[in-house]
Amino acid sequence: MPNTVVDYLHVVAAVIRGGDGRILLAQRPANKHQGGKWEFPGGKVELGETPLQGLSRELHEELGIHVLQASPLIKVRHVYPEGAVLLDVWEVTAFSGEAHGREGQPVAWFEAEQLPTLEFPPANYPIITAARLPAHCLITPEPQNPADFLQRLEARLRAGIRLVVFRAKLLSADDYVALAQEAIRLAHSFGAKVMLNSPPVMLEEADGLHLTSRQLWAEESIYQSPLRDGQWLSASCHDERELQRAADIGVDFAFLSPILPTLSHPGAVHLGWGVFSATVEQVNFPVYALGGMDSSHVATARLGGGQGIAAIRSLWDGV
């Protein structure tokens, strides 16, 4: 019986952020596999090394820098015709030394929003999404008063929120569109992105569409035809089956919930961090932990393989 277990080559890679937020990329030599394409710097983990040790060594050898601060970002498994790789990606937010191509390779700094315009090896594309997403995602509560809602949203944007899921299930279609347009304009003025949850019509100016777990199983036309190039697709998931369905339809990122008990459903069954980590491990896109989350849980979510946390109450109230 043939062996179907894939042997992945463990490779570490870095999303290196400068003080201005730009990201450092290296260009692969023309004579190498995927030559000429841009990549996130890194290399193979050697026997006996931890991923962080391997990353630190590779970045010093390739770029002449010493890693001072790094945290896990995403793991991506990809099978090329030449072999399979596990990309163990870390976000480097502090380093010493001046980055340069010690092996003669071109290196350059790019704005995060420039990354989708560049050519990368196929395994790198989920990393681009992760690099463009923040660690916090605000899901808006049901709007009661439009003016108060926008004032509160502005306060959260001023506090640093850069990803918003606009949710307004009780508004009429016209009121939804009007308030969503105002929210998008406001968010964009802060450089933030807005995903629309169950909009009556998809808005061109929105940054993407967020699906409920029920909509995951809808006809494809519901979630594909409204999207223009560059708009994201995300989804709410509650178990491995739904997360796999999200992968099958090509979401860019997802929420997995409930991770911890919530104030709204204190006695409900929750997944816990162990299940979160094991489930996230099965997919190649960023996943936010949702349910009982506040900012103190970001580090735990990242260590568990997640992008960060999504929340309504705690992020709306500024916890």
What is the meaning of each model-derived region?
Residues 2-23, 75:
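Conserved N-terminal beta-strand and adjoining loop/helix that marks the start
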Residues 22-62, 73-74:
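Conserved Nudix-box catalytic region and its N-terminal flanking loop in Nudix hydrolases
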Residues 76-98:
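Active-site-adjacent beta-strand/loop module that shapes the phosphate/pyrophosphate-binding cleft
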Residues 89-91, 99-132:
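NUDIX/MutT-family hydrolases
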Residues 163-226:
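N-terminal active-site wall of soluble small-molecule enzyme domains
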Residues 179-195, 221-239, 269-294:
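Alpha-helix-loop-beta-strand connector modules within alpha/beta enzyme cores
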Residues 205-220, 231-281:
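Glycine/Thr-rich beta-alpha phosphate-binding loop at enzyme active sites
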Residues 213-223, 253-267, 292-319:
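Glycine-rich phosphate-binding active-site loops on the catalytic face of alpha/beta enzymes
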